[in-house]
Each structure stands twice: as structure tokens, then as C-alpha cells.
């Protein structure tokens, strides 16, 4: 079953699904600044574009481009800066 979600006045959209009992979502972010909260740990992979992020444990902003990924702890939040339309894959760990 697919679950379609929209955030930040439709500037971030995702489609969620399950694979082998693991929750996954794939989506697109339009340019902007966003703050996301996490319930579970997440692995975010950038499919195309770039995400500049700052987790609560990061001293500085870090940019991840196409083909790169990063992890975020559960029960935390992270800030995201998007300068170009970016597609991502999120795996909930």
C-alpha cells in the first residue's frame, strides 16, 4: 500500500511503502529551509540534487549530493537547506 504525504505547504512530497517489513519513503524537496523531526532512526540517500543538513550533533552544516547518504538518530530533529529540486530515499531503521 502506498501512502502519499505532503509537508511545508506542498514543498516536500513523499510516497511511503513497505519492503520486507521495513518502512521506506521516496520523495522530492523543492528549494527552501525545513526542519524535520524523527521518531525512528533514518538513513537518507540523495537520489539527485543536494541536501545541506545540520543534525543536533553537528557543529557545522554538511552537504550531501547525488549518490551520498547520511543517518539521523531517532527521537531527534535535523535542519535541511535545499537549493535545487532534490529527490531522496528515506529508510526507517
From Swiss-Prot:
Q: Which UniProt keywords apply?
A: Glycosyltransferase, Transferase
Gene3D superfamilies in alphabetical order: Jelly Rolls (2.60.120.10)
- Write down the chemical reaction(s) this protein catalyses: a purine D-ribonucleoside + phosphate = a purine nucleobase + alpha-D-ribose 1-phosphate; adenosine + phosphate = alpha-D-ribose 1-phosphate + adenine; cytidine + phosphate = cytosine + alpha-D-ribose 1-phosphate; guanosine + phosphate = alpha-D-ribose 1-phosphate + guanine
Question: What is this protein's function?
Answer: Catalyzes the phosphorolysis of diverse nucleosides, yielding D-ribose 1-phosphate and the respective free bases. Can use uridine, adenosine, guanosine, cytidine, thymidine, inosine and xanthosine as substrates. Also catalyzes the reverse reactions.
Q: What is this protein called?
A: Pyrimidine/purine nucleoside phosphorylase
Question: Which family does the UniProt entry place this protein in?
Answer: Belongs to the nucleoside phosphorylase PpnP family.
UniProt keyword Transmembrane helix present: no
Example GO CC term: the record gives:
cytosol
Entry EC no(s): 2.4.2.1, 2.4.2.2
SUPFAM superfamilies per the UniProt record, alphabetical = RmlC-like cupins (SSF51182)
Domain of life of the source: Bacteria
Could you cite one Gene Ontology molecular function of this protein? Answer: thymidine phosphorylase activity
Would I find Nucleotide-binding among this entry's keywords?
A: no
